[in-house]
Amino acid sequence: ISKGLELGSRSNSQVGNGTPLSRSTATSNFTHFRLNTNYTVSPFKDFIFMLNAGGQYTLNDLLNSEQTGITGEQRLSGFTSGAISGDEAWYVRGQVNKQYRLSKNFSVSPYVYTAGGTAYLNQPTAAERTATSAKSIGLGLEVTGNDEYFFDKSISAKVEFSKNWATGNIENTSSVRLNREHLLVTMAMRF
């Protein structure tokens, strides 16, 4: 639960000719409820099923900083992170991994996923949509390893290819070069 207070914040009446608020009908007095959850289970040896779901509910028109998105690495990863957001939203993502341990410190895990969600604006302007729905499917490969020689670090990498669909032209602006397809490459090193 998040509650906005009007202490020290600007309102639309105080903007004047200065910098406008991020949403013309939003105020700093708001309440929204957000829930994000995940569930992981291994139904068979070396298979992992992951389910991520969540959303946000509000009766208010929110400033951009309080809106929630349905895109991201554990959500609809086939779209640019932050490309689809709204005052209210829901998303769900299911993923199945098959893990191959190549050594004690190195594993490779191909996976397939599907995801969908919708973001809503409570009081859209003439240039905005009331709702933007999206879905994506894809496959990827995760590589994880541990290096015990220098600083005892964990190294992980991911390559994912996705096919996307969305209302309006969101998929066109998110994926200009790949024709509604998205390639995600990440690498992380944890000490």
Task: Go through each PLM region and give its residues.
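Hard-cation-handling environments
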Residues: I1-G16
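C-terminal transmembrane beta-barrel domains of outer membrane proteins
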Residues: T19-F191
